[in-house]
Amino acid sequence: MKIRVATRGSKLSLIQTEELLAQIKAVEPDIRFEIVVVKTTGDLIQDKPLFQIGVKGVFEKEVNLAVLRGEADMAVHSLKDLPSDLTPGLALAGYSRRAPPNDALVSPRGYTLETLPRGAVVGTSSVRRAEFLKAARPDLEIKPLRGNVDTRVAKILSGQYDAAVMAAAGLQRLYGGAPPIPAVPLAVEDLPPPPGQGIVAAVAREEDTWLTDLLRRASDRKAAAEAAAERAFLAEVGAGCHVAVGGIARQTPAGIEFTAGYAQGGRKHLVKVYGEDPTEVGRRAARLVAQAMKKT
C-alpha cells in the first residue's frame, strides 16, 4: 500500500518527514510512501518577520490543504508550526520521538547568554525570543533574521550577527553531532520554547480512520503526552506568534511537569505546574500565564 505524504520542501522538512515515516514503517513494514512537496506562505515570504505576515499557519496551511483536497493522504509538520485549531476535517494523529525542545544560542565563539559581549547583535525574527532576550540582557541589539537553517548559519558566520537564537532540534536533525557552528542550549527558564518544539507531527483526514489509527500506533507515547499538555496550553492561552509566550511539558515518572512563561517590556514571568493529566496541566499553566499577561 502507498501513502502520499505532503510536506514542505526544505532540507530540514524532508529529514523530519523521513524520521516520522521510519517510525510508521517500523509498525507496518510493507507500506510505501510518496513525498508530495508543497510551497507554503512562510517559504515564499522571506523578507518579513512571521508576526508581520498576518496569516495564521504560514508554514502549514497549504500543506494541510493538499490533504483536504485529496492530493495527499497525510501531512507532516513541525508541531510548533501547527495552530491550536486545525482545519475542520483534519486530525492530529502522529508524533515522532522528541528532539531537544530547547532553543540554542548559536555563535562562532560558543557564547552563553551570560558571556555575550555587551551590545552584541543577536539575530531572531521571533517576538518570543526577542522579548525573553531583552528580559535577560537588555543591552543586546536584536536584529531580524529569517531563512532556512543553513542561510541563518551562513549569515552568522559572515559576521552580520554576533549570535542568533535557533531551535536545538532543527540543528540536531540537520547536522547531527557535527554542526558547522557552536550551539549552546538555553535553559527553558531563560527562554521557554514554543509549544511542540522538537516534535514532528502527522495530520490526516478524520474520516480516514485506518490511517489515523496507524499513526497513533506509530506515535512515541512520551512525545504524545507532552504534546497533549502543550496543545492544551496553546489553545487555552490563545497566543499567536505576535505574543512572547512559551510553554514546555516534560513527562516524568510522577506525571507532567510544565514550565511556561511570558515576557514583555524587559520583564518576564515564569510558572511551574505539576500534575498527572496532561491536558489539565497545560490548561492550568495557561491560566497562570494569562493572569500574568493581564497585569502587564
Swiss-Prot record:
It comes from the Archaea. Keywords: Porphyrin biosynthesis, Transferase. Pathway: Porphyrin-containing compound metabolism; protoporphyrin-IX biosynthesis; coproporphyrinogen-III from 5-aminolevulinate: step 2/4. GO terms for biological process: protoporphyrinogen IX biosynthetic process. The keyword Transferase applies. InterPro entries: HemC (IPR000860), Porphobilin_deaminase_cofac_BS (IPR022419), Porphobilin_deaminase_N (IPR022417), Porphobilinogen_deaminase_C (IPR022418), Porphobilinogen_deaminase_C_sf (IPR036803). Binds 1 dipyrromethane group covalently. Its EC number is 2.5.1.61. The modification S-(dipyrrolylmethanemethyl)cysteine is found at C241. HAMAP family: Porphobil_deam (MF_00260). GO terms for molecular function: hydroxymethylbilane synthase activity. Pfam families: Porphobil_deam (PF01379), Porphobil_deamC (PF03900). This is Probable porphobilinogen deaminase. The lineage of its organism: Archaea, Thermoproteota, Thermoprotei, Thermoproteales, Thermoproteaceae. GO terms for cellular component: cytoplasm. Tetrapolymerization of the monopyrrole PBG into the hydroxymethylbilane pre-uroporphyrinogen in several discrete steps. Signal peptide: none annotated. The porphobilinogen subunits are added to the dipyrromethane group. Belongs to the HMBS family. Its cofactor is dipyrromethane. The gene is hemC. It catalyses: 4 porphobilinogen + H2O = hydroxymethylbilane + 4 NH4(+).
